[in-house]
């Protein structure tokens, strides 16, 4: 995987709960928010500084900064607690690795993904606000709604995934790290990655 896309390795982590957190909840929430914004009798303005995207930019900037700040204690703390593997009967792991992820690596991938996603979503919203006025002036009125929906639905699904992942990260910080694992340790997760044997 290219170096610049490393933060997005979080979405490749395998775990039985990933379907719920990465697919079902984000799609459900994203579609619900999009339907609300597009289906109101008086539509909510989407593009512009004071519109939906303009308001979201400020929130994403704060969330991105929080995610970067969260990486500092995760990557510098050498305590045994973060070095332990993530618990559970089927702990999360990367497709190319045999050993389960340690808590440190899992959280690093999680908050790295959040920081990168916030940066990307801010960039998308800024670009959309810049080009939307020109595109709207050149598109027939009957097609504007569908063009807006084609941008807004994927944007909101990604935003919903970031929101769900943020809550998952907060759960680990506030609760999960204090709970002892119910399964025995397997290997040394903080060691160099071990590829699966063919």
Short names for language-model regions:
Residues 146-175:
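Alpha-helical membrane-embedded segments
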Residues 6-20, 97:
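Cytosolic juxtamembrane amphipathic/interface segments immediately preceding
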Residues 57-79:
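Hydrophobic alpha-helical membrane-embedded segments
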Residues 16-61, 138-141, 152:
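Long, highly hydrophobic alpha-helical transmembrane signal-anchor segments
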Residues 46, 71-93:
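Membrane-helix interface/capping segments
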Residues 4-11, 169-198:
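Cytosolic/matrix-facing juxtamembrane and C-terminal tails of multi-pass cellular membrane proteins
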Residues 88-110:
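Short membrane-interface loop/juxtamembrane segments of multi-pass integral membrane proteins
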Residues 36-37, 112-137:
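Alpha-helical transmembrane segments and their membrane-interface junctions
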């Amino acid at each position: 995987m290219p170096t610049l896309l490393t933060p997005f390795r979080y979405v490749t982590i395998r775990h039985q709960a990933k379907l719920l957190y990465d697919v079902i909840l984000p799609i459900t929430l994203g579609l619900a928010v999009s339907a609300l914004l597009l289906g109101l009798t008086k539509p909510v303005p989407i593009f512009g500084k004071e519109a939906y995207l303009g308001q979201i930019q400020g929130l994403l900037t704060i969330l991105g900064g929080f995610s970067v700040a969260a990486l500092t204690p995760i990557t510098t703390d050498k305590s045994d607690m973060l070095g332990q593997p993530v618990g559970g009967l089927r702990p999360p792991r990367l497709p190319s690795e045999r050993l389960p992820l340690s808590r440190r690596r899992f959280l690093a991938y999680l908050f790295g993904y959040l920081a990168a996603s916030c940066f990307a979503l801010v960039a998308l919203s800024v670009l959309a606000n810049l080009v939307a006025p020109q595109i709207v002036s050149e598109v027939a009125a009957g097609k504007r709604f569908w063009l807006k929906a084609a941008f807004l639905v994927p944007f909101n699904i990604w935003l919903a995934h970031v929101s769900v992942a943020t809550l998952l990260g907060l759960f680990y910080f506030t609760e999960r790290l204090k709970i002892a694992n119910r399964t025995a340790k397997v290997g040394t997760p903080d060691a160099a990655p071990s590829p699966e044997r063919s």
